[in-house]
């Protein structure tokens, strides 16, 4: 092999070695991540966060491509023996699009205001933790947010009406907390696509705002609260709703003239004070789950469609409901 070829091979080897050993991770991001690790008491769950290695290879992280200079775009800490509060340094990851702290029973404190700095955030999941305090109003500043999940925490107080101003929100999941007060009137006027709305297992009270009847939810779950009054505005044959769960509240309205969406696959109204007869129109829906037990319904269960495919547990404990799968009407 001549001298020129040898030099070319040596250059190529040096070039490849340099490229392979070069960190993709931004140094500012790496420094921030190491501060986050320290703030969380250096948990074993983050053992891969070694300052001598490329942080884009660390567990719980994702980096973007060259168009964003390989900045950290996702921080997902799921399970593990993590203790402490949400580190303030989280707000110093400016390219973050996904932030998840989930199934961390020793994560305490409030939802930190530093999160408001994450203007590129599209997904925020803080769930199955011991976070306390209110849902902060500053979340409405995250104008790129598409998915918000704050379920299975100990959050309290009222739901900020400002959440309805999020222009790109597709799902609001606030279930299983200790939220009180009423559902905001503003939730009847989201600026963009109507989001899936899940507010179950809280202590919400009062009537449903009439404004909610103006929009077409795909999924709405208000179950296991203290809501009362009329909920008929959520229905309508012209809507495209797939799932409605109003179970275990104190709703009182007559369903006799309530048409349901012809797209409805899930309907749960159990444990309320709903009256009237089940309309024949309900046989037109492609129901996969159906429960109207523990109400004050009367009359004959309409035949046809899906209504007879459900067993008696979907109908029992009503005032005078009859027909298959219950006893024959007399």
From Swiss-Prot:
It holds the Pfam family LRR_1. It is found in: Secreted, Cell wall; Membrane. Glycans are attached at residues 106, 130, 238, 291. The keyword Secreted applies. GO terms for molecular function: polygalacturonase inhibitor activity. Inhibitor of fungal polygalacturonase. It is an important factor for plant resistance to phytopathogenic fungi. PANTHER family: POLYGALACTURONASE INHIBITOR 1 (PTHR48059), POLYGALACTURONASE INHIBITOR 1-RELATED (PTHR48059:SF4). This is Polygalacturonase inhibitor 1. The gene is PGIP1.
